[in-house]
């Protein structure tokens, strides 16, 4: 995914995650690594033209997506400008090392850099940064066959597919390392590397949006995302008193984020609530971990399947029986708001709306129970950003149940909810592609806010250093959101239902340049939904996805690893308890982690290709 160094006044360094890269000691632009070859939430600082908030992906040790990443060198066009790139005194800002060997990076261009022999006209640059070839790490000349590549690797791949060349078998078990200086040594490994990083005859450029429109759009998104990232990364906690650690018995209210002065709707209330590290609290029991994480997941997250009118029970039952989610009809569908999301959590709806409109004024607490009983309202016209705004359904507690801290229907005001997943907010006529992306990119703050809130309630998360808290959030947000919204994908019909209750076919969305990523999302959703996770299992799995000790740039990886092991033990105990006869279920669930990393890599590359095409 793309990452932006907020400490670099010249615009930062963008890196590709998941491709094979070159050695930092080579003569072409020095390899720079993002602060997480794992997904890095830093991508949020950049434009967001994909389906989920950009968040760089992380490298998992057994990530199958990189099984070919270390493929051996192969032959290249040495007459190409890329192969002739000469030494550079890379003027990069300091970055975390440890990105997986294969990341395609972007190097800051220095005034002392010597351009390739054929001049700089064929070098792909982005705001003074030079993009590197995903195959060999040389200077990329453009976007070729679906990836950024040098002229040498482009020509090599073209000849390979046009002439259907069968290369000699590799003498090193197909384990050669492909870098610029040795890419000619093993043709088989080089061709294998080309395929593994995504080169394809059928690959097309992303977007096809006019250059001027892209530049305008990217400038606006860059400003908004920079602001959001600066707020998230701020080391100044807003709480005046320490936040009590949640216990299994009660979940304390979370202090509200203080509004930041900004005219940008959707980013004025970006979370800054990460707390500084505290003295280690007593290690909770496994039962406490399960109950606290499950409660936080239930009360903080607004489930995608709930918004689509499916209760948690029906959701799991549907998946267990093989039928798609969100198919159970509800009586409210024909009573006045057919396109509004069925939100079972009023306060979650309030958080969504307040994040978009900057309305949060005071502290709020989480509801203790799932509300029920919708009161319907008519839909409103789209707002200035194109979002369909519908009054959120007002819920009252079941008869006979009136918790002291629950909301009473009579005291509840209507809340307008702008759906974060609504890609085409109100119809599609007259909307250009860039307008759709623009509206969509500005609607993800609520979803990201919920990830931050959820992280704060993971037992032990706030005991980590603030740097590690931020690093984990930057690296894992995209993966968490992918888990959350997996139920929106109907694999059988090859459709996606957004929170506006509008269904789009894979063909429709693929026409916008996201075909490969969407196919991978469908595949992941099918695998995850087939496991029919319970609410508690889904919450613990989400926590495991977020707390990953192999993220690069960690200050105290031992503490993160200890927390991760605690969560894994709790997840394993819960899975075995729920279905003791299915001994392989826990293993199947863990195998979804590398799938998430692969998705994060693809998401990052799509985002970067979108930005580069605007240049």
Swiss-Prot record:
GO terms for cellular component: chromatin; cytoplasm; dendrite; dendritic spine; nuclear body; nucleoplasm; nucleus. Residues 1-129 are annotated as: Modulating. Disruption phenotype: Mice display increased cold tolerance, higher oxygen consumption rates, enhanced brown adipose tissue metabolic capacity, maintenance of higher body temperature throughout the light phase and increased glucose uptake only during the day. They also show retinal abnormalities such as pan-retinal spotting and decreased response to light and decreased bile acid accumulation. Double knockout for NR1D1 and PER2 show a significantly shorter period length compared with wild type or single knockouts for both genes. Heme binds at residues 419, 603. Ubiquitinated, leading to its proteasomal degradation. Ubiquitinated by the SCF(FBXW7) complex when phosphorylated by CDK1 leading to its proteasomal degradation. Ubiquitinated by SIAH2; leading to its proteasomal degradation. Rapidly ubiquitinated in response to inflammatory triggers and sumoylation is a prerequisite to its ubiquitination. Sumoylated by UBE2I, desumoylated by SENP1, and sumoylation is a prerequisite to its ubiquitination. Signal peptide: none annotated. Residues 285-615 form the NR LBD domain. Expressed during adipocyte differentiation (at protein level). Expressed in skeletal muscle, bladder, lumbar spinal cord, pancreatic islets and hypothalamus. Expressed in developing and adult retina. In the adult retina, predominantly expressed in the outer nuclear layer, where rod and cone cells reside, and also localized to the ganglion cell layer. Expressed in a circadian manner in the liver. Expressed in a circadian manner in the lung with a peak between ZT8 and ZT12. Gene3D superfamilies: Erythroid Transcription Factor GATA-1, subunit A, Retinoid X Receptor. SMART domains: HOLI, ZnF_C4. The modification N6-acetyllysine is found at residues 192-193, 592. A zinc finger (NR C4-type) spans 133-153, 170-194. GO terms for molecular function: DNA binding; DNA-binding transcription factor activity; DNA-binding transcription repressor activity, RNA polymerase II-specific; E-box binding; heme binding; RNA polymerase II transcription regulatory region sequence-specific DNA binding; transcription corepressor binding; zinc ion binding. Binds DNA as a monomer or a homodimer. Interacts with NR2E3 and ZNHIT1. Interacts with C1D. Interacts with SP1. Interacts with OPHN1 (via C-terminus). Interacts with PER2; the interaction associates PER2 to BMAL1 promoter region. Interacts with CRY1. Interacts with CCAR2. Interacts with SIAH2. Interacts with FBXW7 and CDK1. Interacts with HUWE1. Interacts with NR0B2. Interacts with NFIL3. Interacts (via domain NR LBD) with HSP90AA1 and HSP90AB1. Composed of three domains: a modulating N-terminal domain, a DNA-binding domain and a C-terminal ligand-binding domain. This is Nuclear receptor subfamily 1 group D member 1. It comes from Mus musculus (Mouse). The lineage of its organism: Eukaryota, Metazoa, Chordata, Craniata, Vertebrata. The gene is Nr1d1.
């Amino acid at each position: 995914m793309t990452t932006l160094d907020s400490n670099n006044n010249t615009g930062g360094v963008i890196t590709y995650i998941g491709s094979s890269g070159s050695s930092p000691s080579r003569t072409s632009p020095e390899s720079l690594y993002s602060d997480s070859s794992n997904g890095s939430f830093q991508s949020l600082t950049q434009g967001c033209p994909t389906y989920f908030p950009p968040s760089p992906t992380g490298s998992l040790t057994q990530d199958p997506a990189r099984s070919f990443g270390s493929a051996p060198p192969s032959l290249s066009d040495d007459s190409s400008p890329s192969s002739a790139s000469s030494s550079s005194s890379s003027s990069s800002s300091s970055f975390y090392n440890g990105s997986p060997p294969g990341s395609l990076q972007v190097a800051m261009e220095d005034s002392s850099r010597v351009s390739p022999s054929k001049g700089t006209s064929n070098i792909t640059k982005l705001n003074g940064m030079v993009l590197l070839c995903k195959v060999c790490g040389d200077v990329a000349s453009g976007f070729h066959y679906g990836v950024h590549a040098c002229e040498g690797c482009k020509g090599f791949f073209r000849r390979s597919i046009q002439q259907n060349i069968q290369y000699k078998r590799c003498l090193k078990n197909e384990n050669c390392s492909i870098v610029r200086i040795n890419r000619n040594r093993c043709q088989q490994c080089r061709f294998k590397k080309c395929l593994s990083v995504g080169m394809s005859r059928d690959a097309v450029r992303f977007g096809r949006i006019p250059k001027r429109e892209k530049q305008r759009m990217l400038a606006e998104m860059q400003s908004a995302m920079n602001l959001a990232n600066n707020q998230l990364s701020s080391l100044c906690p807003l709480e005046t008193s320490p936040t009590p650690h949640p216990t299994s018995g009660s979940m304390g209210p979370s202090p509200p984020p203080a509004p930041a002065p900004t005219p940008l709707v959707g980013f004025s209330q970006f979370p800054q609530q990460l707390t500084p590290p505290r003295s280690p609290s007593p290690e909770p029991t496994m039962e406490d971990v399960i109950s606290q994480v499950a409660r936080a997941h239930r009360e903080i997250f607004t489930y995608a399947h709930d918004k689509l009118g499916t209760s948690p029970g029906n959701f799991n039952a549907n998946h267990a029986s093989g039928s798609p989610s969100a198919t159970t009809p509800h009586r409210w569908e024909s009573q006045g708001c057919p396109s509004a999301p069925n939100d079972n959590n009023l306060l979650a709806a309030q958080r969504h709306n307040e994040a978009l409109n900057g309305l949060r004024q005071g502290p709020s607490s989480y509801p203790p129970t799932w509300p029920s009983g919708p009161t319907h309202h008519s839909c409103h016209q789209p707002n200035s950003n194109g979002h369909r705004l519908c009054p959120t359904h007002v819920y009252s507690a079941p008869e006979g149940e009136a918790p002291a801290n629950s909301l009473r229907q009579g005291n509840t005001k209507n809340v307008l909810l702008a759906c974060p997943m609504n890609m085409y907010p109100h119809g599609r006529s007259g909307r250009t592609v860039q307008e759709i992306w623009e509206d969509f990119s500005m609607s993800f703050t609520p979803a990201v806010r919920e990830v931050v809130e959820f992280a704060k309630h993971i037992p032990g998360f706030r005991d980590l250093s603030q740097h590690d808290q931020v690093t984990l959030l930057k690296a894992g947000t995209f993966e968490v959101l992918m888990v959350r919204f997996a139920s929106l994908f109907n694999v059988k019909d090859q459709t996606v239902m957004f929170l506006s209750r509008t269904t789009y076919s894979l063909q429709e969305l693929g026409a916008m340049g996201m075909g490969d990523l969407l196919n991978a999302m469908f595949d992941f959703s099918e695998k995850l939904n087939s496991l029919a996770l319970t609410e508690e299992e889904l919450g613990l799995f989400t926590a495991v996805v977020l707390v990953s000790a192999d993220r690069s740039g960690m200050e105290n990886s031992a503490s993160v690893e200890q927390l991760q092991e605690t969560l894994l033990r709790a997840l394993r105990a819960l899975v075995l308890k729920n279905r003791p006869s299915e001994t392989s279920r826990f293993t199947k669930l863990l195998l979804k982690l590398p799938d998430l990393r692969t998705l994060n890599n693809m998401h990052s590359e799509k985002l970067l290709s979108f930005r580069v095409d605007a240049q």
